[in-house]
Swiss-Prot record:
Name the record gives this protein: RNA-binding region-containing protein 3
Keywords of the record: Nucleus, Phosphoprotein, Repeat, RNA-binding
Basic residues bias: start-end ranges: 269-283
Function field: Participates in pre-mRNA U12-dependent splicing, performed by the minor spliceosome which removes U12-type introns. U12-type introns comprises less than 1% of all non-coding sequences. Binds to the 3'-stem-loop of m(7)G-capped U12 snRNA.
GO CC terms of this entry: U12-type spliceosomal complex
Native species: Bos taurus
Main localization, broad class: nucleus
Segments of skewed composition (Basic and acidic residues): 115-130
Matching SMART domains: RRM
Pfam families: RRM_1 (PF00076)
Residues found modified as Phosphoserine: S21, S108
GO BP term (any one): mRNA splicing, via spliceosome
Domain of life where this protein originates: Eukaryota
Length: 516
């Protein structure tokens, strides 16, 4: 064998460039924004796939990084490649393709070594032309040339997929979750087929083929495999036997596929529910008498009559007892002494008066209640149940030490005495009736003038929220209310009571001023 010819050393100016590129430079394309993930060989294969005759890949740095020059055999092929490559999305990058300018003519790519070897090989030129034509045919008539599938579609090719099952669907779901592009393409396909969007609630599970697979229709047996070395001497007989075997296997596969598709398209029949007739037995009187109460089966607890109704108390002879205290006995003794003194005095009167006094039941004197008099002396300020008592006020007040610790009472001053008091630091839940319950004890409601002068103004909104102005009958009542109610805790907050700064209310008569 002859040794292969060594390629001639190429000069720096690329001597063969004059034969490849015309003076206009319409056959050379400049491809920009190539993905950085591709190697130089992959970029060259990509551009040659679109009909490039020679490719020169530039460096990954500088102004022309990720670019390449591609030279095509003629202008028509270059225009066709430009229309197919321009704005093509490849690995997240959009290619920009344009014809090389005059200033780039100096950088026009030199033919690769592989092309020179092909030209210098012993194959004739006609074989190269036929191969190029076949390449163009495969590119134009391929299955998906944009995705790299350049071979034509086989007309005899048919797919035989099994019917869907739970495992197959689970594998598809796993693939959807792991490959985002596949998930997006499935959504596009559902949109094209006008299927409902899967973004709503979970839909009902359709009947699966594997759940309703009929048992009486098994799959047809597979054809026996042909022997590895058939004992046929002639080549023609071998070819004919192979063709017949392949045809028979294809026919069997088609029949098997049609049967599978028919079984997959069959709608499964739902099993009809078998109604069981319940024969009701006739109950006997003996059984009905011994039936347990239905209350035991109920969800609610058993209630006895004593839990619902008040039990009548047995009426008996009640013993009435009188407990007379020693004070009452002393009072009785005093009354008896008074009566005796009166009788002695009446004995000196004339008989007519004595007879008049003896007519009827005589005089009945009320018994003095010593406990009430003592309570009045001890607590002369106790009010009826409508108002608060002094004991409750004292219990509800905070001590002076606690007042010193609170910030509300630090700069406390009672103010100038008058008949109106100012209350602040009131809780949100305080109402006028609460203030009336506290400060009403300083008003005599039997007097009409005091009832008119008693006034409560509670601020519930605005800047004065939580404050109140209370008008009392006179300064004495106001001073007493300030002394006793200051620091009283109402709804968790101690009240701060002061004399109001406003002037005294103007009155026409001098008597009104005296009352204040």
């Amino acid at each position: 064998m002859a040794a292969p010819e060594q390629p001639l050393p190429m000069s720096r100016g690329c001597q063969n460039s004059s034969s490849l590129s015309p003076p206009r430079g319409d056959r050379t394309l400049l491809v920009r924004h190539l993905p950085a993930e591709l190697t130089a060989e992959e970029k060259e294969d990509l551009l040659k796939y679109f009909g490039a005759q020679s490719v020169r890949d530039l460096s990954d740095k500088g102004r022309l990084k990720h670019t390449a020059f591609a030279t095509f055999p003629n202008e028509k092929t270059a225009v066709k490649a430009l229309t197919r490559l321009h704005q093509l999305k490849l690995l997240g990058h959009t290619l920009v393709v344009e014809f090389a300018k005059e200033q780039d003519r100096v950088h026009s790519p030199c033919p690769s070594l592989g092309t020179e070897k092909k030209k210098r090989s012993d194959d004739p030129v006609e074989d190269d032309k036929e191969k190029k034509e076949l390449d163009c045919l495969t590119i134009e008539n391929g299955i998906a040339p944009n995705h790299g599938l350049t071979f034509p579609l086989n007309s005899c090719l048919k797919y035989m997929y099994p019917p869907p099952s739970s495992t197959i669907l689970a594998n598809i779901v796993n693939a959807l979750a792991s490959v985002p592009k596949f998930y997006v393409q499935v959504l596009h396909l559902m949109n094209k087929m006008n299927l409902p969007t899967p973004f709503g609630p979970i839909t009902t599970r359709p009947p699966m083929y594997e759940d309703y697979m009929p048992l009486h229709a098994p799959l047809p047996p597979t054809s026996p495999q042909p022997p590895e070395e058939p004992p046929l001497p002639d080549e023609d007989e071998e070819l004919s036997s192979k063709e017949s075997e392949y045809e028979s296997s294809d026919d069997e596969d088609r029949q098997r596929m049609t049967k599978l598709m028919e079984l997959a398209n069959l709608q499964p029949k739902r099993p009809k529910p078998i109604k069981q007739r319940h024969v009701r037995k006739k109950r006997k009187i003996k059984d009905m008498l011994n039936i347990p109460s239905s209350a035991s089966h109920s969800l609610h607890p058993v209630l006895l009559p004593s839990d619902v109704f008040d039990q009548p108390q047995p009426v008996g002879n009640k013993k009435i007892e009188f407990h007379i205290s020693t004070d009452m006995q002393v009072a009785f003794k005093k009354d008896l002494e008074k009566q005796q003194n009166c009788e002695e005095e009446n004995s000196d009167l004339p008989a007519t008066e004595a007879d008049a006094s003896n007519i009827g039941f005589g005089k009945i004197f009320p018994q003095p209640n010593l406990n009430i008099t003592e309570e009045i002396k001890d607590d002369s300020d106790e009010m009826p149940s409508e108002c608060i008592s002094r004991r409750e006020l004292e219990k509800g007040r905070i001590s002076r030490e606690e007042m010193e610790t609170l910030s509300v009472f630090r700069s406390y001053e009672p103010g100038e005495p008058n008949c109106r008091i100012y209350v602040k630091n009131l809780a949100k839940h305080v109402q006028e009736k609460d203030l009336k319950f506290i400060f009403g004890r300083y008003v005599d409601f039997s007097s009409e003038t005091q009832r008119i002068m008693f006034d409560i103004r509670l601020m519930k909104e605005g800047r004065m929220k939580g404050q109140a102005f209370i008008g009392l009958p006179n300064e004495k009542a106001a001073a007493k209310a300030l002394k006793e109610a200051n620091g009283y805790v109402l709804f968790g907050k101690p009240m701060v009571v002061q004399f109001a700064r406003s002037a005294r209310p103007k009155q026409d008569s001098k008597e009104g001023k005296r009352k204040c």
